[in-house]
């Protein structure tokens, strides 16, 4: 029974969670800290010193020798600097282990070395990390030993947010304030807090480490830049929910254990649609904790893969021709006393509070569809969105038959009198029980779908932080809640006013609702007719961040300033250009050093074969060798010409000013040139001797794991 895991015993064992604080902190200190966590009360340095001491003692017992402020700058990954607990040696040469409240609360990383979009110059280096006590500290064990990781926010010396966490916490305050106002209108006086609750489904690929090491494109960019499809892809639908291979099962087992120890509620695991693709989904958590947990999960997925002789690929589109990877963001609003504001109940037409919340969200998504689209903008997502594998790049809302029918009743007659219910599903097999179907089907093609008691935003890229999309969701919902509350609080007749408001929102924003097939080519034309924003690429979407509408929205809730929004737009433009530049240079490097030499060797062998056969007898047939030689030589020339053109465009890009101008040039000129280079190379792979091809094929990568 060596493989037995006592989940209850190991869960959260490396987390300084509430139960640990209750056990270790003096009662007064614990109560004060809980007030800070739950009510935002300022934490005194006296209390911080006590918390820091107990946190240090607990961490040392867990094997920690260092601590770090663990934060999420605008690089897309987490950052940390390790400091040991040791102090300067005393006269006898011995050291003490120390960790103060000041060290817990504040750190000073170099702000100029992280992306700031112009907010920090190289000579303006000071930045601050500050403890986020709402997200528990944890001890991470790796080759460096035990590290006490303290979740923190990161800001500049002048106070601008330079991370993902700070605006997320601000947006949580905004939605909490406005949602509580809404609840009070309906007579709820007991709920004290409304928190966005999120579960993020994480998709990923696994490939063999030795094969990964032979692919410079995977090493440098996270995705394959060349590669012909094997005879079989995902068309048999036999990988999705299929039996998990033993090697992958062993990997998943260790991933689960690592997640559980750090308090991450890894719940559901399965094979995804594409070969070598998988998914891991946690249970819901408050959105700031869910965002931290997702970062922890991605690190664990990568770390454990290495131990098992594999590499975990989190890129949105590591392989052309098969599905890419996303991160479905399941978002709901819950109170501290267990009420889900997105729970329709059995009779949604009678649930006025739910209908108001629902129509407010419809209005929010319709008015800020461009911002929601931008929140999922990523250079890798450009390769994924819009294919028959992921939502289209057009924001729409799926409600399903039941809620659509209720809204149509409201719009057409002014009154909703009934709700559709699920019917009994008769399987036709006596030994199988009959059961009630759901009142509506699911729509996997919708980017923003209502799924029972939550909204599922399916656009987010697999390697991206979930913070950005949730900042947008929280803030746009808060804006419409505020507008609704302003009107309803001033109304003389609440019942009439709320009824009229629900009908108004449903009527004016029904264009955002689409329950059809988002993959259908007709949908884009229909979306254009409806006036919905169509933003196919990251570069198209970024301007949504800095419109007057967006600035007014975010500044009104103190989520972002104009300067912060402009800096983030600049960072995204730069990030796009740098990513494409690296990919383009990698393609040229691989073509120059690996592919062209390999094809030259192959054509030489063919030429020698032709000459050798003809030397025996001029009458012998060499048409096969000749045909292959002609085709490979033609494709080789096309490859060289395409490579030269791409090299020239890479050099030309340097002349374009950093920011939007350079990003647009990469999208409009460099990306098409990259595709032009890939085409002849992939054709060559199909005819060149496999033993001579310089890198593992798609078949090797996705079927031999």
What does each model-found stretch correspond to?
Residues 1, 10-18, 177, 181-183:
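Flexible inter-domain linker/hinge segments
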Residues 76-92, 109-112, 117, 215, ...:
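Short linear, low-complexity motifs centered on an aromatic residue
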Residues 10-125:
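Active-site core of metal-dependent hydrolases
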Residues 1-7, 704-705:
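Basic/polar N-terminal segments that are highly enriched at the extreme N-terminus
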Residues 87-122, 237, 360-361, 484-493, ...:
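Short, intrinsically disordered, low-complexity segments enriched in Ser/Thr and Pro
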Residues 505-705:
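C-terminal amphipathic alpha-helical interaction region
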Residues 125-314, 323-326, 333-570:
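Glycine-rich, acidic/polar active-site loops that bind/position phosphate-bearing ligands
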Residues 64, 68-70, 293-307, 333, ...:
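Hydrophobic/aromatic-rich, well-ordered segments within soluble, folded domains that form packed cores
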